[in-house]
Protein backbone atom coordinates (compact mmCIF):
# COMPACT_ATOMS: atom_id res chain seq x y z
CA UNK A 1 0.00 0.00 0.00
CA UNK A 2 1.21 3.50 -0.84
CA UNK A 3 2.43 5.53 2.13
CA UNK A 4 0.15 8.34 3.29
CA UNK A 5 1.25 11.84 2.34
CA UNK A 6 1.03 15.24 4.00
CA UNK A 7 1.30 18.27 1.71
CA UNK A 8 2.17 21.73 2.99
CA UNK A 9 1.73 25.20 1.61
CA UNK A 10 4.91 27.24 2.06
CA UNK A 11 4.49 30.98 2.75
CA UNK A 12 2.48 31.52 5.91
CA UNK A 13 2.22 27.80 6.64
CA UNK A 14 5.63 26.16 6.86
CA UNK A 15 7.74 29.30 6.88
CA UNK A 16 7.16 32.85 8.09
CA UNK A 17 8.37 34.67 4.98
CA UNK A 18 6.38 37.89 5.37
CA UNK A 19 9.30 40.17 6.40
CA UNK A 20 11.37 39.23 3.35
CA UNK A 21 8.48 39.25 0.88
CA UNK A 22 7.52 42.71 2.13
CA UNK A 23 11.11 43.94 1.89
CA UNK A 24 11.44 42.79 -1.73
CA UNK A 25 8.02 44.13 -2.70
CA UNK A 26 8.78 47.55 -1.24
CA UNK A 27 12.19 47.56 -2.92
CA UNK A 28 10.39 47.24 -6.25
CA UNK A 29 7.78 49.85 -5.41
CA UNK A 30 10.41 52.41 -4.42
CA UNK A 31 11.98 52.21 -7.88
CA UNK A 32 8.73 53.33 -9.53
CA UNK A 33 7.54 55.78 -6.85
CA UNK A 34 4.60 53.68 -5.70
CA UNK A 35 3.87 53.98 -1.94
CA UNK A 36 5.27 51.14 0.12
CA UNK A 37 3.10 48.45 1.67
CA UNK A 38 2.91 48.61 5.47
CA UNK A 39 3.72 45.45 7.46
CA UNK A 40 0.15 45.25 8.78
CA UNK A 41 -1.15 45.04 5.20
CA UNK A 42 1.04 42.19 3.96
CA UNK A 43 -1.67 39.55 4.43
CA UNK A 44 -3.67 41.18 1.64
CA UNK A 45 -0.86 40.67 -0.84
CA UNK A 46 0.59 37.21 -0.24
CA UNK A 47 -0.74 33.95 -1.67
CA UNK A 48 -0.51 34.05 -5.45
CA UNK A 49 3.17 34.76 -6.03
CA UNK A 50 5.33 37.82 -6.59
CA UNK A 51 3.62 38.93 -9.79
CA UNK A 52 0.22 39.20 -8.12
CA UNK A 53 1.78 40.96 -5.11
CA UNK A 54 3.09 43.68 -7.41
CA UNK A 55 -0.21 43.96 -9.29
CA UNK A 56 -2.14 44.32 -6.02
CA UNK A 57 0.23 47.01 -4.75
CA UNK A 58 -0.30 49.03 -7.92
CA UNK A 59 -4.07 48.51 -7.82
CA UNK A 60 -4.22 49.65 -4.20
CA UNK A 61 -3.06 53.09 -5.33
CA UNK A 62 -5.01 53.21 -8.59
CA UNK A 63 -1.80 52.93 -10.58
CA UNK A 64 -2.06 51.02 -13.89
CA UNK A 65 0.69 48.61 -14.89
CA UNK A 66 1.30 46.94 -18.24
CA UNK A 67 2.90 43.54 -18.84
CA UNK A 68 6.27 45.01 -19.79
CA UNK A 69 6.59 46.95 -16.53
CA UNK A 70 5.21 44.01 -14.56
CA UNK A 71 7.77 41.66 -16.12
CA UNK A 72 10.60 44.04 -15.23
CA UNK A 73 9.42 44.49 -11.64
CA UNK A 74 8.92 40.78 -11.13
CA UNK A 75 12.48 40.19 -12.35
CA UNK A 76 13.72 42.84 -9.90
CA UNK A 77 11.67 41.29 -7.09
CA UNK A 78 13.12 37.83 -7.70
CA UNK A 79 16.69 39.16 -7.88
CA UNK A 80 16.29 41.09 -4.62
CA UNK A 81 14.48 38.28 -2.83
CA UNK A 82 16.98 35.62 -3.91
CA UNK A 83 20.02 37.74 -2.99
CA UNK A 84 18.83 38.08 0.60
CA UNK A 85 17.63 34.52 1.10
CA UNK A 86 16.79 33.25 3.67
CA UNK A 87 16.89 36.68 5.31
CA UNK A 88 14.55 36.78 8.29
CA UNK A 89 12.43 33.86 7.09
CA UNK A 90 12.17 30.99 9.55
CA UNK A 91 10.00 27.89 9.97
CA UNK A 92 7.03 28.52 12.22
CA UNK A 93 7.31 27.15 15.78
CA UNK A 94 6.77 23.41 15.91
CA UNK A 95 7.34 22.79 12.19
CA UNK A 96 10.51 20.74 12.59
CA UNK A 97 9.02 18.49 15.24
CA UNK A 98 5.88 17.99 13.16
CA UNK A 99 7.89 17.00 10.09
CA UNK A 100 9.84 14.49 12.15
CA UNK A 101 6.65 13.04 13.67
CA UNK A 102 5.13 12.37 10.29
CA UNK A 103 8.39 11.05 8.83
CA UNK A 104 8.74 8.60 11.71
CA UNK A 105 5.14 7.47 11.14
CA UNK A 106 5.86 6.64 7.51
CA UNK A 107 4.27 9.67 5.86
CA UNK A 108 5.65 11.21 2.69
CA UNK A 109 5.94 15.02 2.88
CA UNK A 110 5.64 17.49 0.00
CA UNK A 111 5.21 21.20 -0.67
CA UNK A 112 2.57 22.72 -2.96
CA UNK A 113 2.99 26.49 -3.23
CA UNK A 114 2.17 29.37 -5.54
CA UNK A 115 5.73 30.60 -5.06
CA UNK A 116 7.94 29.88 -8.07
CA UNK A 117 9.53 26.44 -7.85
CA UNK A 118 13.13 27.65 -7.95
CA UNK A 119 12.53 30.24 -5.23
CA UNK A 120 10.76 27.63 -3.10
CA UNK A 121 13.60 25.14 -3.41
CA UNK A 122 16.24 27.80 -2.75
CA UNK A 123 14.45 28.97 0.38
CA UNK A 124 13.97 25.49 1.81
CA UNK A 125 17.57 24.63 0.96
CA UNK A 126 18.81 27.79 2.70
CA UNK A 127 16.78 26.77 5.76
CA UNK A 128 18.24 23.25 5.46
CA UNK A 129 14.89 21.50 5.31
CA UNK A 130 14.56 20.82 1.57
CA UNK A 131 15.57 17.17 1.90
CA UNK A 132 12.55 16.49 4.10
CA UNK A 133 10.24 16.79 1.09
CA UNK A 134 9.77 14.25 -1.68
CA UNK A 135 8.49 16.99 -3.99
CA UNK A 136 8.55 20.80 -3.90
CA UNK A 137 6.14 22.10 -6.52
CA UNK A 138 5.59 25.76 -7.33
CA UNK A 139 3.31 27.90 -9.45
CA UNK A 140 5.35 27.14 -12.57
CA UNK A 141 5.95 23.41 -12.04
CA UNK A 142 2.97 22.05 -13.96
CA UNK A 143 1.43 24.95 -15.85
CA UNK A 144 -1.46 25.22 -13.38
CA UNK A 145 -1.48 26.47 -9.83
CA UNK A 146 -3.70 26.66 -6.77
CA UNK A 147 -6.68 26.95 -6.53
CA UNK A 148 -6.62 24.55 -9.51
CA UNK A 149 -6.84 21.14 -7.78
CA UNK A 150 -4.49 19.63 -10.37
CA UNK A 151 -1.62 21.50 -8.72
CA UNK A 152 -2.18 19.59 -5.50
CA UNK A 153 -2.98 16.26 -7.14
CA UNK A 154 0.06 16.42 -9.42
CA UNK A 155 2.27 17.34 -6.45
CA UNK A 156 1.05 14.26 -4.60
CA UNK A 157 1.69 12.02 -7.59
CA UNK A 158 5.16 13.48 -8.20
CA UNK A 159 6.03 12.77 -4.56
CA UNK A 160 4.94 9.16 -4.98
CA UNK A 161 1.76 9.52 -2.96
CA UNK A 162 -1.89 8.68 -3.49
CA UNK A 163 -4.55 11.45 -3.44
CA UNK A 164 -6.84 9.02 -1.59
CA UNK A 165 -4.33 8.86 1.28
CA UNK A 166 -3.45 12.53 1.53
CA UNK A 167 -3.98 15.52 3.79
CA UNK A 168 -3.07 19.13 3.11
CA UNK A 169 -1.95 21.88 5.49
CA UNK A 170 -2.41 25.52 4.50
CA UNK A 171 -3.17 29.01 5.73
CA UNK A 172 -5.47 30.56 3.15
CA UNK A 173 -8.72 30.31 1.26
CA UNK A 174 -6.68 29.32 -1.78
CA UNK A 175 -5.27 26.29 0.04
CA UNK A 176 -8.64 25.29 1.46
CA UNK A 177 -10.47 25.66 -1.86
CA UNK A 178 -7.75 23.69 -3.64
CA UNK A 179 -7.91 20.78 -1.22
CA UNK A 180 -11.70 20.71 -1.25
CA UNK A 181 -11.78 20.67 -5.06
CA UNK A 182 -9.32 17.77 -4.99
CA UNK A 183 -11.41 15.88 -2.43
CA UNK A 184 -8.59 16.01 0.10
CA UNK A 185 -8.99 16.94 3.79
CA UNK A 186 -7.29 20.17 4.79
CA UNK A 187 -5.85 21.45 8.05
CA UNK A 188 -5.82 25.25 8.25
CA UNK A 189 -3.37 27.14 10.44
CA UNK A 190 -4.76 30.36 11.91
CA UNK A 191 -1.45 32.24 12.09
CA UNK A 192 -0.78 32.58 8.37
CA UNK A 193 -1.32 35.16 5.67
CA UNK A 194 -5.02 35.74 5.16
CA UNK A 195 -7.05 38.85 5.83
CA UNK A 196 -10.09 36.84 6.94
CA UNK A 197 -10.34 34.14 9.62
CA UNK A 198 -9.65 30.74 8.04
CA UNK A 199 -12.66 29.31 9.87
CA UNK A 200 -14.86 31.18 7.39
CA UNK A 201 -13.60 28.95 4.58
CA UNK A 202 -14.63 25.74 6.38
CA UNK A 203 -11.45 23.64 6.42
CA UNK A 204 -11.54 20.15 7.92
CA UNK A 205 -9.99 21.52 11.11
CA UNK A 206 -8.13 24.62 12.33
CA UNK A 207 -4.95 24.55 14.42
CA UNK A 208 -3.09 27.36 16.17
CA UNK A 209 0.29 25.65 16.59
CA UNK A 210 2.07 22.79 14.86
CA UNK A 211 2.05 20.86 18.13
CA UNK A 212 -1.63 20.24 17.34
CA UNK A 213 -0.75 18.62 14.01
CA UNK A 214 -0.44 15.04 15.20
CA UNK A 215 -0.10 11.82 13.26
CA UNK A 216 -3.35 10.68 14.83
CA UNK A 217 -5.11 13.73 13.42
CA UNK A 218 -3.67 13.14 9.97
CA UNK A 219 -4.74 9.51 9.93
CA UNK A 220 -8.19 10.39 11.25
CA UNK A 221 -8.76 12.95 8.49
CA UNK A 222 -7.63 10.55 5.77
CA UNK A 223 -9.87 7.77 7.06
CA UNK A 224 -12.82 10.10 7.41
CA UNK A 225 -12.40 11.39 3.85
CA UNK A 226 -12.33 7.79 2.62
CA UNK A 227 -15.55 7.00 4.46
CA UNK A 228 -13.83 4.65 6.90
CA UNK A 229 -14.89 4.32 10.51
CA UNK A 230 -12.83 6.49 12.84
CA UNK A 231 -12.23 5.23 16.36
Residue ranges and their predicted role:
Residues 35, 108, 185:
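Residue-level detector of anion-binding/catalytic polar loops
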Residues 59-97:
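Metal-dependent phosphoesterase signature
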Residues 1-44:
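Active-site neighborhood of HAD-like aspartate-dependent phosphohydrolases
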Amino acid sequence: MTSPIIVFDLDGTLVDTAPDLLDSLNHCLRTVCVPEVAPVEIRRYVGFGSRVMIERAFAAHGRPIDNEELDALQKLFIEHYTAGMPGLSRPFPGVMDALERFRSAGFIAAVCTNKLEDLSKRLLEALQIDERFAAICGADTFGHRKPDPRHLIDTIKLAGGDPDRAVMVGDSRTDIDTAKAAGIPVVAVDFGYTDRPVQEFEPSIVISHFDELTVELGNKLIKSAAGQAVA
